[in-house]
């Protein structure tokens, strides 16, 4: 377990995010008020980097680290994490002994982490052809290296319909490795249009957005009521009476 970094004070950016819930039977859906520790915010820049890494090696296992910062909401006191970058392993991984790979790369990763001025928030991995659940090696890797409450394990895959992903977190629950977590997609400023529409980069078929991911246009302001008609002009004065002779 690593030393807990001091969280930065910052309001939870719910208004700039889209909440994604696992679309699996039996998984409780969050409404954005989850009391679970360290809600996950996945910044769109990191989403793009991760998906490009997966698409570049769709049939080979990939590996990388998730980097960002920890924050505390000053009003609610909730601790949360924002993943804003990835440290990808460029070499190809053969087999699935991720514990060995992480152990070999740990010191190099710490050096890159110091250069990035970030906090290690977790790791991601793919194992094509082995299903959408964590393997025994993935579980061992998490239990040995990623035991802090803000750490996450992410399983990704390139499928015919695009990239899919799942977040997991070590917990006392025996089924933690079978229980994907909800997360927030933290939007870039240009992904929020002037009319309130939100553009998502998440195409994962195994997650669904809570509520509409696109907001409709703002309602039109009420049309001004027509001005009352002008009063009719006053009647003309009667003609003067003729003088009697």
What are these regions (language model features)?
Residues 218-239:
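Intrinsically disordered, low-complexity proline-rich regions
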Residues 240-245:
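Membrane-anchoring helices that localize proteins to membranes
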Residues 1-120, 129-224:
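Conserved beta-strand-loop surface patch within small alpha/beta domains used
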């Amino acid at each position: 377990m690593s030393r807990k970094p001091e969280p930065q004070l910052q309001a939870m950016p719910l208004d700039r995010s889209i909440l994604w819930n696992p679309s699996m039977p039996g998984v409780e859906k969050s409404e954005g008020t989850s009391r679970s520790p360290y809600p996950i915010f996945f910044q769109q820049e990191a989403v793009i980097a991760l998906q490009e890494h997966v698409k570049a090696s769709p049939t080979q296992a990939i590996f990388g680290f998730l980097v960002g910062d920890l924050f505390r909401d000053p009003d609610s006191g909730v601790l949360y994490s924002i993943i804003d970058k990835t440290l990808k392993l460029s070499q190809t991984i053969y087999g699935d002994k991720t514990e060995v790979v992480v152990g070999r790369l740990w010191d190099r990763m710490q050096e890159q982490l110091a250069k990035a001025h970030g906090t290690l928030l977790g790791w991601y991995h793919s194992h094509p052809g082995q299903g959408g659940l964590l393997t025994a090696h993935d579980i061992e890797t998490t239990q040995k290296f990623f035991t802090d409450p803000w750490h996450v394990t992410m399983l990704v895959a390139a499928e015919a319909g695009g990239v899919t992903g799942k977040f997991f977190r070590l917990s006392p629950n025996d089924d933690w490795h079978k229980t994907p977590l909800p997360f927030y997609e933290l939007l870039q400023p240009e992904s929020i249009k002037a009319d309130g529409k939100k553009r998502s980069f998440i195409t994962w078929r195994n997650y669904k957005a809570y509520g509409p991911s696109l907001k409709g246009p703002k309602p039109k302001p009420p049309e001004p009521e027509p001005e009352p008609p002008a009063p009719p002009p006053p009647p003309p004065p009667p003609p003067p009476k003729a003088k009697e002779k």
